[in-house]
Amino acid sequence: MDIYSPAEGSVTEIDGRRKPTILYVFGGGFMEGNRRDGTAMEWFRDLTDDGYGVVAIDYRLGLKGVRGVTASEFVVLLERAINLAVEDLFSATSYLIEHRDELGIDPSALVVAGSSAGAITALQAEYEICNGTPVASVLPEGFNYAGVMSFAGAILVKGGSIEYSRRHPCPTMMLHGTDDDLVPYSRIDSDGYSFCGLDALAKVFSGNGFDYRAYRYLSNNHSVAGFMHFTLDLQKSFLERNVMARHKLNVDALIEDPSLPYYPSGNSNLYDIR
């Protein structure tokens, strides 16, 4: 993992509260990617210049080299890949908690953020914590992240029903393109599994009174996975109000902004490998 401290001279507190540390999980379809990709590094500088610490982690790529499988086979492989990534995220989190004094990190102020596969990992990790599943048992009892920021993420559930059974999720900010053809904006059901993106999750969060912000980018696609640098104002508002001040400010916005990046990605579904 790489650890980036707030820039010298930056403002690291607001009203006596220390700004959280952002725990970043990179994207790449569970096939590729690394913690030092250029888009993320630019965003890390934005955050550290503004007084936030950043930790960027690695994780096992559970779909690396996978080709020529059926849809039924693939959903099982996808579940395994997500589980591996979540396990590694929890391992990194446990390390940060154990070494908090020497690293200068406050475990109660860890915000996990991710892009694409990393966003799936972040959302899925919070889902596992809130349901008390065995994979989350490696974390200290009662631990939860201070927040989640998802750039084009989703969760994978069995049985079709999204349930946070043990506890409410932490404050969660989700950004997603309404025309995302790689990670579902709404949901995909296959062989007893449901792959649920922002639209499906926002319905559950709204219906249960959870603390969340949903930003839906009209007619944009998976480009939103790289919107970290372009949405700093939204992130800082979420971090300062929902996370630091613990002010439940729910937002559900449909955004049409042609100035934001749009990269054609074709019609193939990343999670439908032939």
Model-predicted regions and their roles:
Residues G16-G29:
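Short beta-strand element of the alpha/beta-hydrolase
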Residues R35-I57, K64:
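Short amphipathic alpha-helix adjacent to the substrate-entry channel of hydrolases
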Residues E13, A136-N208:
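The feature captures the conserved acid-bearing segment of alpha/beta-hydrolase catalytic domains
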Residues M1-E13, T21:
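A short loop-to-beta-strand scaffold at the N-terminal edge of the catalytic core in hydrolase folds
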Residues G29-E32, V54, Y95:
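Serine-hydrolase catalytic-loop signature spanning alpha/beta hydrolases and amidase-signature enzymes
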Residues S94-H168:
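Primarily recognizes the serine-hydrolase "nucleophile elbow" in alpha/beta-hydrolase
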Residues S206-R274:
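C-terminal catalytic histidine-bearing segment of alpha/beta-hydrolase fold enzymes
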Residues V75-E102, G197:
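Alpha/beta-hydrolase active-site loop
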